[in-house]
């Protein structure tokens, strides 16, 4: 197990508490509607599906309260700042915000399915009870709607034998909002798959804004009061457990039982979602305000492999290493905002991003900046926002792993290190950095070469050659490149990058790398930072667990992954 417990105990505890609250709320609501005398007559028509529908509704309210919080980026950045002196275990939980957002969404889907299925049975029971002519208690209760609805005594929402379930579904507030919410939820979930987010980000972006219809629908879903229970006054006058068996004698002079009166369950969903909705509205207002501040593009560089570098200035902009921003180009799309990691260092007088062509929006943006005689497109920026990479200097030893354009957060870190060396910063806690960059194309290395060359020279001059150990891996090589590398193996610099460190072909042998690091730093706390695909994250996470020790006096690896 290695230090799996050390890395994940708080996450597991948090999930257990969240799941426990879901179970508690479901069971508590189920027993309430299954046992309470107030809903005795309602159960005579619907049975236990009433309790299932109401229990799932309560869990939907609870999870809908939580769903917006993990995507309040300014709130997370604020918490990250206030938790700067908290334990790394607690701070790491903020990096799992999107994972928790997805888990809450899955729970909403589960309870939505339970709620819909339960109400399908409920409407079927309502319909059959309304059609019944056998004089049973259910049929008598269903007929109360005929002439006493104005008095508040109706129980069955199907008001006549000619009314269909479909008609009630699309004409009642509960039915219509339920359909709208379900359609919005289905579209949001299906468009949030990794394939669509990676290949058709604009589809994901637009459909996810259907949450507005989901939240509005949830807020007014219960206004119609379709689920009804006996009023307190009516129960005091005619208790259901005493009077249900003598329903044929209701209102007889010689009987103490009177015809029951019912009232709708007051809407509660709006109470659950009000606070997070207000918080999210404030979040969006802040985003809008910051996005309207003028951004000045000071430099545009087109690197090989279709990588665009933008250097910008913005009044009041302050950043930390590894942070990211959201970028909008109104001339391409007014509503689309895309996240990009900052590649500049906090010590620089500008902030920069590197954009690789990966989809329609990025391709259009690069094409717009390639037009030499056209005016530079206007750019809007929101951020910056914090990520796991902010904590890199909290570790004695840091392992940085970037795949392709995923190297961008580490560009910021390495630049900041260069400036710290320039200023002789003695507060730098980090004593060793291992940097791995995995790329398919040789051209991708070019824009990073100058930085690595400068770092090599700076560390040589300061006598800190061993501070940075970097390895570049080329996965898209062919026999010509390998042959050329073999012929020039004795050269002092690499033929691909021009750096002193030779490029490796293929992928890293992570077990060997971690074993070497663990041996070299037997008593250190090692932070492993990744910006790359899920498969690579899985391999690195396993290695962190395998080569860590529960003994705090021995080496421990803490895995961190960029999520935005």
Curated annotation (Swiss-Prot):
It catalyses: NADPH + 2 O2 = 2 superoxide + NADP(+) + H(+). Pfam families: FAD_binding_8, Ferric_reduct, NAD_binding_6. It is an enzyme of class 1 (oxidoreductase). Residues 397-536 are annotated as: Interaction with NOXO1. PROSITE patterns: FAD_FR. InterPro entries: Cyt_b245_heavy_chain, FAD-bd_8, FAD-bd_FR_type, Fe3_Rdtase_TM_dom, Fe_red_NAD-bd_6, FNR_nucleotide-bd, RBOH/FRE, Riboflavin_synthase-like_b-brl. It is found in: Cell projection, Invadopodium membrane; Cell membrane. The oxidase activity is potentiated by NOXA1, NOXO1 and RAC1. Its cofactor is FAD. Gene3D superfamilies: Nucleotide-binding domain of ferredoxin-NADP reductase (FNR) module (3.40.50.80), Translation factors (2.40.30.10). Residues 1-9, 73-102, 190-206, 418-564 are cytoplasmic. It is a multi-pass membrane protein. Its EC number is 1.6.3.-. Phosphorylation at Thr-430 mediated by PKC/PRKBC positively regulates its interaction with NOXA1 and enzyme activity. Glycans are attached at residues 162, 236. CDD domains: NOX_Duox_like_FAD_NADP (cd06186). The modification Phosphothreonine is found at residue 430. It is linked to Defects in NOX1 may play a role in the pathogenesis of very early onset inflammatory bowel disease (VEOIBD), a chronic, relapsing inflammation of the gastrointestinal tract with a complex etiology diagnosed before 6 years of age. VEOIBD is subdivided into Crohn disease and ulcerative colitis phenotypes. Crohn disease may affect any part of the gastrointestinal tract from the mouth to the anus, but the phenotype of children with onset of Crohn disease occurring younger than the age of 10 is predominantly colonic, with a lower risk of ileal disease. NADPH oxidase that catalyzes the generation of superoxide from molecular oxygen utilizing NADPH as an electron donor. NOX1, NOXA1, NOXO1, RAC1 and CYBA forms a functional multimeric complex supporting reactive oxygen species (ROS) production. Interacts with NOXO1. Interacts (via FAD-binding FR-type domain) with ARHGEF7 (via PH domain). The phosphorylated form at Thr-430 interacts with NOXA1 with greater affinity. This is NADPH oxidase 1. It comes from Homo sapiens.
């Amino acid at each position: 197990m290695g230090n799996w417990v050390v890395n994940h105990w708080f996450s597991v505890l948090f999930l257990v508490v969240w799941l426990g609250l879901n179970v508690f709320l479901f069971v508590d609501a189920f027993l309430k509607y299954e046992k309470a005398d107030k809903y005795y007559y309602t159960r005579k028509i619907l049975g236990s599906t009433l309790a299932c529908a109401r229990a799932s509704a309560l869990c939907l309210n609870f999870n809908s309260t939580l769903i917006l919080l993990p995507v309040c980026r300014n709130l997370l950045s604020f918490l990250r700042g206030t938790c700067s002196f908290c334990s790394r275990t607690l701070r790491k939980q903020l990096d799992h915000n999107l994972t928790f957002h997805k888990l809450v969404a899955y729970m909403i889907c589960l309870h939505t399915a339970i709620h819909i299925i339960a109400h399908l049975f409920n409407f079927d029971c309502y319909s059959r009870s309304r059609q019944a002519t056998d004089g049973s208690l259910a049929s008598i209760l269903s007929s109360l709607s005929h002439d006493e609805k104005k008095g508040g005594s109706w129980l069955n929402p199907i008001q006549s034998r000619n009314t269909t379930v479909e008609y009630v579904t699309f004409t009642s507030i509960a039915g219509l909002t339920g359909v709208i919410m379900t359609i919005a939820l289905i579209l949001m979930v299906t468009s949030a798959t990794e394939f669509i987010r990676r290949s058709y980000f604009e589809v994901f972006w637009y459909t996810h804004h259907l949450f507005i219809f989901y939240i509005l629908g949830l807020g007014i879903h219960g206004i119609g009061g379709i689920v009804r229970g006996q009023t307190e006054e009516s129960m005091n006058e005619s208790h259901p457990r005493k009077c249900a068996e003598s329903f044929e004698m209701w209102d007889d002079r010689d009987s103490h039982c009177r015809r029951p009166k019912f009232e709708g369950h007051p809407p509660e969903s709006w109470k659950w979602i009000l606070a997070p909705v207000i918080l999210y509205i404030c979040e969006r207002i802040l985003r809008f305000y910051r996005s309207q501040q003028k951004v000045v593009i000071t430099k545009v560089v087109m690197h090989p492999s279709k990588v665009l570098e933008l250097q910008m200035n913005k009044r009041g902009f302050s950043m930390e290493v590894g942070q990211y921003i959201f970028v909008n180009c109104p001339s391409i799309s007014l509503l689309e905002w895309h996240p990009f990691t900052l590649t500049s260092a906090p010590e620089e007088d500008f902030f920069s991003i590197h954009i690789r062509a990966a989809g329609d929006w990025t391709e259009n943006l690069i094409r717009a900046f390639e037009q030499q005689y056209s005016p530079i497109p206007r750019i809007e920026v929101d951020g910056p926002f914090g990520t796991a990479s902010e904590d890199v200097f909290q570790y004695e030893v840091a392992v940085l792993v970037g795949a392709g354009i995923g190297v961008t957060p580490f560009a910021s870190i390495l630049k900041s290190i260069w400036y710290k060396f320039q200023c002789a910063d003695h507060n730098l806690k980090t004593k060793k950095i291992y940097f791995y960059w995995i790329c398919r194309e040789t051209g991708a290395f070019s824009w990073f070469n100058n930085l690595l060359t400068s770092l090599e020279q700076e560390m040589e001059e300061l006598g800190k050659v061993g501070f940075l150990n970097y390895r570049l891996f080329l996965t898209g090589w062919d026999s010509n490149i390998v042959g050329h590398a073999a012929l020039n193996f004795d050269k002092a610099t690499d033929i691909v990058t021009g750096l002193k460190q030779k490029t490796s072909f293929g992928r890293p042998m992570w077990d060997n790398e971690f074993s070497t690091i663990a041996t070299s730093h037997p008593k250190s706390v090692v932070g492993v930072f990744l910006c790359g695909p899920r498969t690579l994250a899985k391999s690195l996470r396993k290695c962190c667990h395998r080569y860590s020790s529960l003994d705090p006096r021995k080496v421990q690896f803490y895995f961190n992954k960029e999520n935005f």
